[in-house]
Design a protein with these regions (language model features):
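Short hydrophobic beta-strand element within catalytic cores of glycosyltransferases
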Residues: 313-316, 330-333
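Short alpha-helical donor nucleotide-sugar binding micro-motif in glycosyltransferases
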Residues: 277, 282-287
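Nucleotide-activated donor-binding/catalytic signature segment of Leloir-type glycosyltransferases, i.e.
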Residues: 232-278
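Extended catalytic core of nucleotide-activated donor transferases of GT-like folds
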Residues: 16, 60-155
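Acidic anion/phosphate-binding donor-loop and adjacent secondary structure
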Residues: 133-134, 171-186
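Acidic donor-binding loop of glycosyltransferase active sites
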Residues: 285-299, 312
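Conserved donor-binding/catalytic core segment of Leloir-type glycosyltransferases
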Residues: 16, 182-199, 205-209, 220-222
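A charged, aromatic-enriched C-terminal amphipathic alpha-helix characteristic of glycosyltransferases
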Residues: 354, 358, 368-398
């Protein structure tokens, strides 16, 4: 299908969000929070082009917003009129999610049906840099491409693209803020992010394995479940761990079993499974420290941002998108960043490997000097005070509105 569909008479002030909204993925959380700000702002009515049916409301506060989004989503399905492939050209502007596909001919997507707006904008978060003519041509199709971190924007600007802007993502300050710490007998090392080579969980396991031998009260608490397939070959490529990991009958990775196989005592590892975003604050409340040893971040690592906003002392790899989160005293940076020892550097030559010993030293520093750790955690929370979804999304709304008015 290529056209305007059956009817677009009631689409005044609509602004399409061309990806799946929800709480299960970073993109989903991003979209829901952007939509909430847009609803409050009232210049645009956000429209979710949902692929997987209705969005589910996790909290009573979100129920009204989700109901409106689902209602508009149903209306977009009427515009499609049952077609399963093709392109619907909308009479309203659309924001598109862009990832590593921005580097490939034709901007390939994982679905047969797509939407195009009267004006098109992109939010671009890529981890692999295959910069080429396709990157330029794809990005040039959009009125504005909002990069998810300064590193992403620098890559696009280096290609000579004049239409880039920055959209650093936000946090929900009504959920993620410092709370009084619970009394507990364990030193809880939290590590989050879907399990994959890029996120550096193998580095965390290697470091905690050493740390745990010195501190029997330490426990590694993980939120590492990955709903997508994992390359076990990649997990073990750096030599820190055996990458082979089993899944249970529900398709969930057996994180605890994998950690034990890689040398962590059973009493010092707990995997919390798939935790809804609205409940992550309970996890951060129990954390003594949070560790993020990513080899690359195309955005600014939403889980790290939430942990910082909650006042948790954070250890961050000093590379790519993480650099946007760092000041002199708001976290514990891992500065020893080495090129990857891999035979397949294409697209990942900018990725960096954190040093296991430096990570162990950072954990020891937090363990032995809680005063410094608490001060850095407090500074991190203050820093994230400027990163609310409202403060981050309003400039994007302004830029989009101005671009539309300039047409």
């Amino acid at each position: 299908m290529n056209g305007h569909g059956n009817s677009q008479k009631n689409t005044k002030n609509w602004l399409g969000l061309n990806w799946q909204l929800g709480s299960a993925t970073g993109w989903g959380v991003l979209g829901l929070n952007m939509a909430a700000v847009m609803e409050k702002d009232r210049r645009f009515k956000p429209v979710s082009f949902a692929e997987l049916g209705e969005i589910k409301a996790e909290t009573n506060e979100a129920a009204g917003l989700v109901a409106r989004l689902n209602k508009r989503s149903i209306e977009t399905r009427h515009l499609i009129d049952g077609k399963k492939s093709g392109l619907l050209r909308c009479r309203f502007p659309v924001i598109h999610s862009l990832g590593n596909n921005v580097h490939f001919e034709g901007l390939p997507k994982m679905r047969d049906f797509d939407f195009a707006g009267s004006i098109n904008f992109g939010i671009c978060v890529f981890e692999k840099d295959y910069s080429n003519d396709f990157t330029f041509n794809n990005a040039a199709q959009f009125e504005v491409v909002f990069a998810g971190c300064k590193w992403n924007q620098a890559v696009l600007k280096k290609l000579g693209l004049p239409n880039t802007d920055l959209f650093l993502h936000g946090i929900d300050s009504s959920i993620f803020y410092p709370r009084p710490k619970r009394e507990q007998n364990r030193f809880v090392v939290f590590a989050g992010g879907k399990l994959e080579y890029r996120k550096g969980q193998d580095i965390v396991v290697a470091a905690f394995r050493l740390f745990a031998k010195r501190h029997s009260d330490a426990v590694l608490a993980t939120v590492w479940q990955n709903p997508w397939s994992i390359s076990t070959d990649e997990l073990g490529i750096a030599g820190h761990v055996d990458g082979s990991i089993d899944v249970d009958e529900n398709g969930c990775q057996k994180i605890e079993e994998w950690a034990v196989q890689n040398g962590i005592p059973p009493s010092q590892i707990v995997d919390l499974g798939m935790v809804p975003n609205s409940m992550m604050s309970d996890v951060y409340d129990q954390a003594s420290v949070a560790v993020f040893a990513s080899r690359c971040e195309g955005g600014t690592n939403m889980v790290a941002m939430e942990a910082m906003a909650s006042g948790v002392p954070c250890i961050l790899s000093a590379n790519t998108g993480h650099l946007d989160l760092m000041t002199e005293d708001n976290c514990f940076p891992l500065f020893k960043q080495s090129p990857l020892n891999t035979q397949k550097p294409k697209g990942i030559s900018h990725w960096r490997e954190s040093d296991v010993d430096e990570l162990v030293e950072a954990l020891e520093r937090v363990y032995h000097d809680r005063e410094e750790a608490n001060a850095r955690g407090s500074n991190g929370a203050k820093f994230m005070g400027d990163w609310t979804w409202e403060r981050r999304t309003r400039p994007l709304i302004e830029r989009i509105q101005q671009s539309i008015q300039d047409q």
